[in-house]
């Protein structure tokens, strides 16, 4: 569920509260799954126990003892350094600059920015049993648990090409494997424009850090393995050639393959509604708000950091393709589907954010229309339906309320001309009927029908 946090401008606690609304793709401990939210949980847990921000705890317990002075926790601070690195990405045969991605809200999952020299201090502490110059930095009891296998990541079987690289398990935040007969502990990661890997061999007291300023780069693992072969005096594998051959094979297999988007598209269809009907805010408690705007008769999608040049292209019926900036034409695009209720109104949209899960459904929010108290006063009074008297009144300055006997008072949200949504009842609407500029009745629009109440 990385799209929930990626580029989200919310607090750390807000992200934490989203977790309960995110559908799991497997039961607890059924299979191994990497989840950035769980690293966030650990960071927040430490904050609650110690009563200090995660950043302060890392400084006190790790940076200061190791003499790490230049590392920071935000790309905002990174850019204040005299020699900060720029991130890049590759598309086809071109290299282009990527803007920094601020991930402060989910910081414990990977917001630390550090040099190779300072990261090497961290790697060497682990390579030396958790000690620095004989002083214990990482408690021995935790050290052993952290580099002990707790769950299989995958089969990790020896392959024909590299039979001496096998096993794949997870410790406490560390991936464990056997590299040519040596016990390897490693963790890598990627964020916009940057790739990294930290590894160490506890039996050999060797630590290796590789940092690359390119997006999703395979160079980190290639360089790590090449250094390992030399430092541990192992037979040298041409890891660069292996990776290049794999890339060429993938390009060969994909050459001439028809884009899946064109294969699945139903031609000759049209959207069911005018463009303006799709505009609005759509909300999911685990993902937040997606905003759809109409820019010169083209729908634009705004979500978290996706704010510019993300447009919706009609695919078929009420399904649209999401077109991202700098996205290659051959890439299969994400789809969003707009949904309507029984009244024929667009009231939701869904998106396949996770391939192994159901599409995420975002409910369309009511857009409140500014209405003065004077305008609201014309709707107040008593209405009758089937012998029942319903009261409409104003609460506070300009909040219209409706009271049905035996039910709680309902707040109404003005959404159109003489039209109100129930704030707490999905699918319920009130529409006032006027004759000669005077309210004569109101229609209750409910999922099971429309009911008229005449004004007394």
List where the protein language model places each region.
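Active-site-proximal loop and beta-strand segments within enzyme catalytic domains
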Residues: 1-36, 43-44, 50-56, 60, ...
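Short alpha-helical patches at coil-to-helix transitions and adjacent helical residues
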Residues: 34-39, 116-120
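Catalytic loop of the DD-peptidase/beta-lactamase superfamily, centered on the K-T-G motif
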Residues: 17, 47-60, 64, 82, ...
């Amino acid at each position: 569920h990385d799209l929930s946090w990626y580029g989200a401008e919310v607090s750390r606690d807000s992200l934490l509260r989203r977790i309960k609304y995110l559908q799991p793709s497997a039961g607890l401990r059924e299979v191994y799954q990497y989840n950035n939210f769980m690293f966030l949980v650990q960071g927040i847990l430490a904050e609650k126990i110690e009563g200090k921000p995660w950043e302060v705890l890392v400084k006190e317990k790790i940076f200061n003892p190791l003499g790490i002075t230049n590392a920071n926790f935000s790309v905002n601070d990174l850019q204040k350094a005299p020699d900060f690195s720029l991130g890049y990405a590759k598309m086809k045969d071109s290299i282009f600059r990527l803007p920094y991605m601020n991930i402060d809200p989910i910081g414990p999952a990977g917001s630390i920015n550090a040099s190779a020299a300072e990261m090497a201090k961290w790697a060497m502490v682990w390579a030396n049993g958790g000690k620095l110059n004989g002083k214990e930095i990482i408690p021995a009891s935790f050290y052993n648990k952290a580099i002990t296998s707790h769950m299989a990541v995958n089969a990790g079987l020896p392959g024909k090409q590299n039979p001496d690289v096998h096993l794949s398990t997870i410790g406490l935040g560390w991936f464990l494997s056997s590299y040519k007969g040596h016990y390897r502990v490693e963790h890598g990661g990627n964020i916009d424009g940057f790739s990294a890997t930290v590894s160490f061999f506890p039996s050999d007291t060797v630590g290796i850090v590789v940092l690359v300023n390119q997006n999703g780069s395979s160079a980190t693992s290639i360089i790590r393995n090449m250094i390992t072969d030399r430092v541990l005096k192992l037979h040298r594998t041409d890891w660069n050639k292996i990776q290049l051959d794999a890339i060429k094979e993938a390009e060969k297999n994909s050459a001439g393959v028809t884009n899946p988007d064109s294969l699945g598209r139903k031609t000759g269809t049209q959207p069911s509604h005018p463009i303006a009907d799709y505009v609005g805010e759509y909300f999911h408690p685990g993902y937040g708000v997606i905003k759809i705007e109409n820019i010169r008769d083209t729908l634009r999608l705004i979500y978290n950091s996706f704010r510019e040049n993300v447009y919706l292209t009609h695919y078929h019926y009420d399904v649209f393709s999401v077109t991202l900036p700098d996205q290659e034409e051959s890439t299969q695009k994400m789809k969003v589907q707009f949904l309507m209720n029984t009244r024929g109104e667009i009231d939701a949209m869904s998106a396949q954010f996770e391939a192994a899960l159901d599409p995420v459904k975002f409910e369309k929010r009511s857009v409140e229309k500014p209405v003065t108290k004077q305008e609201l006063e014309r709707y107040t009074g008593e209405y009758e339906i089937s012998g029942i008297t319903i009261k409409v009144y104003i609460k506070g300055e300009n909040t219209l309320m409706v009271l049905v006997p035996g039910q709680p008072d309902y707040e109404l949200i003005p959404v159109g001309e003489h039209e109100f949504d129930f704030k707490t009842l999905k699918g319920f609407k009130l529409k006032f009927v006027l004759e000669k500029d005077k309210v004569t009745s109101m229609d209750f629009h409910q999922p099971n029908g429309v009911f008229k109440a005449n004004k007394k």
